[in-house]
Amino acid sequence: MRVLARSLLVVASVAVLAVSAFAWAQVRILDRSTASASVIGSGAGTAAEQNILLLGVDSRTDPQGNPLPPALLDALHAGGSGDGGDTADSIIVVHVPAGGGRATAISIPRDSFVQLADGYGKHKINSAYSRGVADTTDALTSGSASAGAPTSAYAPQAAPAPSPNDPAVRRAALAAGARTTIDTVQALTGLTITHFASVNLAGFADVSQAIGGVPVCLRAPVDDSYSGLALPAGPQLVSGTQALAFVRQRHGLANGDLDRVVRQQVFLAGATSKLLSAGTLANPFALSRLSGVMARSVTLDSGWDVLSFATQMQGLSAGSVTFRTIPTGTMELSTPEDGQAVQVNPAQVRSFVTDAIDVDSGIAPPPQPVPSDAAVMRAASQSDSSSSSDSSGGSDSSGGSGSSGDSGSSDSSSGSDSSGGSGSSGGSGATAAAPPAPVPAPITAAAPGCVN
């Protein structure tokens, strides 16, 4: 019996070692097969703490610059190969503290009106990527057969300019778009970006399938013809084309792009929870599927050591990532060239980012919640009804809470300050009367909750 037990132990040990070796090999394959781009400045990737810029790009090509198949675009409700415009429609900075600990993921709404890097002026932040792509494409393809024409019949013929669809041109252009976006995000947040990852349209669908679906929860059923999303209310798993539609839908949502930002956060929270709690990073078969997805849909900066990062990620628990959204002002900011945009105050964004990281990492205590206008009004009403009409205490109570008229004004100003105060203070004359955007509550990977 003892010999049998030892034999079983040996067999089990060999099996564990074999599976572990296969998993490690899959991580190495993932590291080698993923497309890379030189987009991070020298020395930025050596910091102990990590600030990772994640972009979801509305691109119709794969990381190697090849066009996505028309059948796939049709299935994704993504239009044709000429649609999309190479805009960064999902922008998230993930801060991982030195030595591990709680990570903070901060979303930047795609329509945020900010100063772009590389001299592009003030525009919506999602266009930083597309402007870098377009200008680099033009620069690489502007030559012609007549440029540098031979001076004699015996001179070699000039090579024709490459096509904008040439995979090498696309790769260079996408890298330029990434660099412009990185510099823009660094200036807005005050963080030094140490690593970069982008995923194309197919990536959300592919990743969700590779991990067996992503848990999400909807407050109400959805049937959206624009994105192709058709889901019932309540908790459920989304994968494939429905996963992409879940993070892309904004038509029919009360807060438009801000609700889409929350959708993206909930999706990533669910994916993070499933990856970490289910031990996907230690599952060789899941890693095998993920390596194929990475090759088709993901681009990383060339200096990113995926093996070390995978080891670091295994130290995180499922609930150790908090998702937040930068403070914003009005969602109806009139702009000279870009239509309506989301107003942001860069100084306030930098302060918010610093405070959020300190709170999530445990350096600072969480702030006390600010009562809403409705709560203040209810408190004032209850105070008035419980006091006599001629009591001076009622006057003091009303004054203490700020009379109902002043209270609403004061709290609204305070509330807008925490959500991007420049919006309600009238930083732009055309939008001074517009209300500030609602402040999305933080979302944790452990309990993301239901969304619109």
Describe each region flagged by the PLM.
Residues M1-N452:
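Non-catalytic, solvent-exposed segments at the cell envelope interface
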